[in-house]
Amino acid sequence: MKILVYGAGVLGCNLARNLFHAGKDVTLLARGNWAEEIRKNGLRIKDQFSLRTSVSRIPVVTTLAPDAAYDVIFVVLRYTQLDSVLDTLRTNRTKNIVFVGNNVQARALAAALPEKNVLFAFALSAGHREPDRVVSIDLKKITIGQLRGAVSNAELIGEIFGGTKYKVVYELNMEDYLLCHAAFVMPAAFACYKTDGDLKKLRRNTVYLGRVIDANIEGYRAIRNAGHDILPKADADFESEKYRKTCLRFFKLMCATSLGKLCASDHAMNAIDEMSALNRDIKQFFDENGAAYPVWQALEAEAGRYLR
């Protein structure tokens, strides 16, 4: 099975490295100085919480030609970059396309590629890229699947990830999963912008963290009331006191440790365009469905000098 990972940021590099180490025939599409660095010195990934740095001699390309044949292409780009690659994907012969990352317009994106088998995924890794390496935490867990009602891709996913160290969650309704993910991460991004990327400023601010949870609940309520599922299923009881307590513990941990920088503020501060677009599009979803989200709007206003 030939696999292309299209995009060499933190998520793409971790995905390519993990597939490569499992013996998969994987190629990484990178650009500019970063492509040359990988070609010359290998893909270097430093684990944030250990002294270990892996070096992987992964084949690198800089373009996707129409006749380049792969069994699957993982598109690992920012939400704001996806439209720019659609023509390239349309003209390429590969049928199976997996979009990895934030997305609140999954159904529209799949409709834009009617001749393809379009899947979506979200991988649990985070960090930042330096000139000669990636520094990250990689939990080796990926949620992947198609839109509700689409043909099953269980066999394909099993073939891709068989023999890897990934914990794979096969999700039959990735549209709703990604909507819910956006409703969770955007309030956290507002917190990053409020503190100029230093979440430790909020470690004792339980009132503000409570508002972050309130905004998340507003988002989930809007999604549920519009007829969508709350996913993962563990979040279905999002209006319960148990859910609030679990979220508060999580956000306090994020604000008190380096996890906040690595898992939230690094990306939020370096991907303001993506977070702005994600916020814009999920608010459009809220408005189209007549949802009220006053706490969300208040947090957004406090982060306004960053959002575009």
Regions found by a protein language model. Give the residues of each.
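Rossmann-like NAD(P)(H) cofactor-binding subdomain of soluble oxidoreductases
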Residues: 52-135
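Active-site-proximal catalytic alpha-helix in oxidoreductases
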Residues: 175-203, 207-220
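N-terminal glycine-rich dinucleotide-binding loop that anchors FAD/FMN and/or NAD(P) in oxidoreductases
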Residues: 43-60, 185
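Rossmann-fold dinucleotide-binding core
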Residues: 105-183, 187
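NAD(P)+-binding Rossmann beta1-loop-alpha1 motif at the extreme N-terminus of oxidoreductases
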Residues: 1-51
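Hydrophobic anchor at the start of a short beta-strand
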Residues: 3, 25-26, 97, 118, ...
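Helix-loop-beta segment of a Rossmann-like dinucleotide-binding subdomain
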Residues: 133-143, 193-203, 258-269
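NAD(P)-dependent Rossmann-like dehydrogenase/reductase catalytic/cofactor-binding core
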Residues: 217-220, 224-308
